Structures are given as structure tokens and as C-alpha cells.
Regions:
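Catalytic alpha/beta active-site cores
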Residues: 1-214
């Protein structure tokens, strides 16, 4: 999807940035560039020894990650350890019973998780076999653009929250007559108020690039 002018990536032994151009050295000693030079967007690291190459196809970015010390990169001629592809999808955070949120305690967990996502500080540590692992939100990715300016891309997919339909009620909040209130209204109030952290940029990261709440 981002072909070279000549040769193939399998034969690449190094990448370098010359001016506004990505140069690729091949194993036969020749040097080539992209067939469509407009697909090169930027890089990270040193221009003579970049750790990342940012490309673009159909308005979606691709990052070639380079690390010759990595257990995968050490087996590649150019040290390529991975290729990250930007996705156009959204990530749904569910308040419905598909996540078994059926009572007040469950709803508190759901809202607390949404708060952590909107503030950017949600983190979970767990054991996987003998190893302790921690999951947290990815930071934004910073590159040097082809015109030598700083370029920042989101490190996370766009998140939307799915509230419960209006036919359900929940005992988490009762009205003055002791009746359960509609769960959809409860979700709407909490998820909207929590999402203000994103709109007012009080958190670590930004979810919406358009200043919107996605429900």
C-alpha cells in the first residue's frame, strides 16, 4: 500500500531522511524512495537513524517501527520490529447489561471506568502467568514532519459511550416516591458530566478532536 520506487521492503537494510524525502537503502547497495513521495509524512528519532517512519495511505497513517535490539527487529535486515496501522474505528465503552452492570455497585464501577478514560488516568495491574502486567491508555505519538515541524497524532482510538435504553430502570437512584428512575437518564447524566473532563481538557489526554461528546 506504500510501495517503493524500486525494490521491496524485505530487502531494505536502512532508512534515512534527506530533506523532505525518505531514502531506503537496499541490500544490493542501491538506494530508493517511495513511489509516491507524498505518502511520506515524518519520522521519529534521528534523521540518519530513525526509530519510526510515518507514512500515509487513504488518509490513514502507518508507522514503521525500527529497533535492531528488539527480539523481532534483530531478525530483520533494517531492524523493523513492527508496523502500526491507524484505525478508523471507534471503541465502545458500555454501560449496558452486556458488562453485567445491573445494580448501584455495578454502575459505580462503570462510571468510575469512564471517568478514568476521560481523565486519561485509568490503569489496571494484573498477573498473567508469572508476570505482572499493567494496562493504561497509550500516550499521543510525536513525530518530526517532512517540513521539520512537530507533528502529534493521537495514541488512542476515539471512544464513545453506550448508555442503557430508556425502558430499563435501576435501583441506584430512587425518586421521592421510592420508585427506580429510568436507567438511561441516569447514564446520560453521569456520562455527560464525566465527559466534561475531555471537553474542558482537564485530563492527561484528549478523546475528541472536535470538542464533542460521543454517546
Amino acid at each position: 500500500i506504500v510501495p517503493l520506487e524500486s525494490g521491496v521492503y524485505e530487502d531494505a537494510i536502512s532508512f534515512m531522511i534527506l530533506g523532505e524525502s525518505l531514502q531506503v537503502e537496499l541490500s544490493d547497495g542501491t538506494r530508493t524512495e517511495l513511489k509516491d513521495t507524498n505518502q511520506y509524512i515524518g519520522f521519529s528519532g534521528d534523521n540518519n537513524n530513525p526509530s519510526g517512519i510515518l507514512l500515509k495511505n487513504n488518509n490513514l497513517h502507518l508507522e514503521i517501527q525500527i529497533d535492531k535490539d528488539h527480539n523481532i527487529g534483530m531478525d530483520d535486515l533494517a531492524g523493523i520490529k513492527d508496523v502500526l496501522v491507524e484505525s478508523a474505528i471507534t471503541t465502545i465503552q458500555d454501560c449496558d447489561d452486556s458488562v453485567a452492570a445491573v445494580d448501584a455497585a455495578d454502575k459505580v464501577i462503570v462510571y468510575r471506568n469512564w471517568l478514568g478514560l476521560m481523565k486519561g488516568d485509568l490503569k489496571e495491574t494484573f498477573m498473567k502467568g508469572d508476570f505482572e502486567m499493567t494496562r493504561s491508555l497509550n500516550p499521543d505519538r510525536t513525530f518530526t514532519s517532512k517540513d521539520n515541524k512537530e507533528l502529534t497524532l493521537p495514541g488512542r482510538s476515539l471512544m464513545l459511550v453506550r448508555n442503557v435504553g430508556h425502558l430499563m430502570t435501576n435501583s441506584a437512584v430512587l425518586d421521592k416516591n421510592g420508585n427506580e428512575i429510568p436507567e438511561g437518564i441516569l447514564d446520560a447524566m453521569f456520562t455527560i458530566c464525566i465527559s466534561k473532563h475531555d471537553l474542558e481538557k482537564t485530563g492527561n489526554y484528549s478523546n475528541s478532536r472536535k470538542g464533542s461528546i460521543y454517546i
